[in-house]
Amino acid sequence: MNTQNFCFVLKQNSHLLREGCFGLEKENVRVNQDGTLALTPHPAVFGDKGKHPYITTDFSESQVEMITPPLPSVGEALGFMETLHDVVTENIGDELLWPQSLPPVLKENQEIPIAHYSGEFKDKEYYRQKLAGTYGKERQLISGIHFNFSFSEKLMDILLKSGVCGNSMEEVRETVYFRVVRNFLKYRWLFIWLYGESPLAEETLNVISLKTGEKQPMKCGVSLSLRTSPLGYRNREEFFIDYSSLEAYNMSIDKLIRENRIDGPHELYLPVRIKFLEKDNGSPSYIEVRIVDLDPFTKSGVCASAIYFSHLLLVYSLLKEEKGSLTEEELQRATRNQDMASCYGRDEKKELKCCSITVQQKATSILEDMERILSEYGVLDDEIYRQEMQHNLYLVQNPEKRIGMVLYENINRVGFVPFHLEKARQYREATISGGYRFHGLEDMEMSTQLLLKAAILKGIGFEILDRKENFIRLFDGKKEEYVMQATKTSLDSYVSVLMMENKVVTKKVLERAGISVPGGYEYTSPEAGMADYRLYAGKPVVIKPKSTNFGLGITILKHNYDETDFKAALQIAFEHDNTVLIEKFIPGREFRIFIINDEVVGILHRVPANVTGDGVLNIGQLIDMKNEDPLRGKGYRTPLEKIRKGREEEMFLKQQGMDFNTVPKEREVVYLRENSNISTGGDSIDFTDDIDDSYKAIAVEAAKALNVKITGLDMMIQDIHAPATPDNYAIIEMNFNPAIHIHCYPFKGKNRHLNHKMIRALGF
């Protein structure tokens, strides 16, 4: 390979060096509330562990493994993993996810259940039984993170077309990935020295010595990462793998298999692996970095800085000049340096096995070279990567600030089990209180985020087709469904959606079906509406666009004595449509009834946007304070919406003789709107189990009348306990795109899990 030309092509396409596919795999041991190993089976809610693409088991039945799909950025991979962590946490009852790579409390003669498999996957269980006999169950219980990375396909295509490193895609992949691995193996000690996070084990933990076969305490030197030390996840013997070429690599592994020293490539516990996929014709597909410890300071267990640095080190390994091979002596030296970083990483004055230089001095030299080369190729033009590079330079100059050092001090101060147990409890609480998010996709509507979380639980794949429009594809190998904004699906016909969108048509169809709706008239201009003002003066009315959703453009005038307010309400409605309805206001409380496939699956009473006075702050200030609640946001990305301070709110306050500067009395509740949509700042209260069944039956009949399978139906009810009559209720609206998140995370009441019910309705 012509190195000069190779580097020239990379520099010409440096913007592609940061791109690629990124994936994470993570294991956590399930523990009881006291920190002991949970002996319950892998939760059945996750389905078949042999087939689930995201959630399975590792060595032990008590050890959950979480796997992200390949994603286009480190940030999205981190977000997906945190979401997986939340999904698992939400479905293991009172159990906790142990946040440390090293095992929790293991009693004397502790039972450590091997992961159970059946049917076509039974061989996985047999393989684990063999590992238990060879390495001991305690060692196999050590958990960690694998970071998977492949370079951009665009970059690979450009390298192929340039001819600088091969005449076929297979040759290009071989050249690129083997070059990266050779360099990464030499520098891996630096990653461990910066980001090792398993400095101490529980005092009673003993593991089988790989040399003598006898049990020994899990301790070595002034350790920083016992997981990556000789006491951690290693093979019985140190193998020499030839990384000079794909052919040499395969030959060295085949030799180990023939000599019965390993069962197959999967038993090579290497710090970094080259992975192969059939789609790439047996050539390297991606690199798996296996030396990342769990981070007890992060809920997901994945330190973002560690992953970003790993990516930078991989890119640096591509750009850094090297001779094209590693001798056995060089590989041994690299392993000794890994052992030094693992076992003596807390001593920054320790010398490396290459030269008479301290680890801190060598780390500084490498990081400065990384900064120079990565800057030269434009990799650090990205703000995130530039900050991460600066962070690592700071750590090498302030080694006591390394995360493993901080962890060591905390364990020494609090104790191994108490420290990690408290973290596990904190993270469980954080998930339970804020688990509505799909991390990394927070810019999408919350209903879509929740639907995707339900898909993860079921092991359903998904593709985001249009992020801004919340348009996704769901698939599982048997079928696929296209969904927009969580509830626009193939279950409903286009004409049914149009009927719901058009409030005039909705009313006419429901009237023909014998269902009560408000009386009123439609107008095609503000002037026509104003001409009939005397018809409505002094009577409570609702003025709304003919086609509306989410309560947009709706004004309720309960008293309607002010012609100016009537005119303003008409103007607001006409801003949203060219036809407006003026209807009789129906007394009672408004309820949102959600229907899926002719079944009522959730009912909410929505309290209009409101504030409660304290005798000091004015209404505007009280709104600002209430909007600080983290559950409130904008654009349907949180369970509740922020309260607005717009014309509609101003008009409603005026009708009450108030404005935004009015100071309410202490405990006085002031309403900002008459309509109770969550989308305009209202509060949601679950009433699914409280309303008389007659109203539910009417709601289902209404859905059938419009031939719709998914709808959010708004019904006014005077007395929820009295059976329905033609005069004590009315359906005021049927929505074709109802939000599901308000039923999943109501202000008060049960989570009705509409995201999971939507997944079932779609046939998954």
Kindly give the residue locations of the regions a language model identified.
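Loop-rich catalytic cores of soluble enzymes, especially ATP-dependent carboxylate-amine ligases
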Residues: 9-11, 106, 117-137, 141, ...
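ATP-binding N-terminal substructure of ATP-dependent carboxylate-amine bond-forming enzymes
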Residues: 432-501, 505-508
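Terminal catalytic/cofactor-binding subdomain
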Residues: 1-132, 139-143, 165, 179
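A long amphipathic alpha-helix within ATP-dependent nucleotide-binding catalytic cores
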Residues: 255-268, 313, 572, 576, ...
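Active-site nucleotide/adenylate-binding loops and adjacent lid/helix of ATP-dependent enzymes
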Residues: 473, 482-644, 693
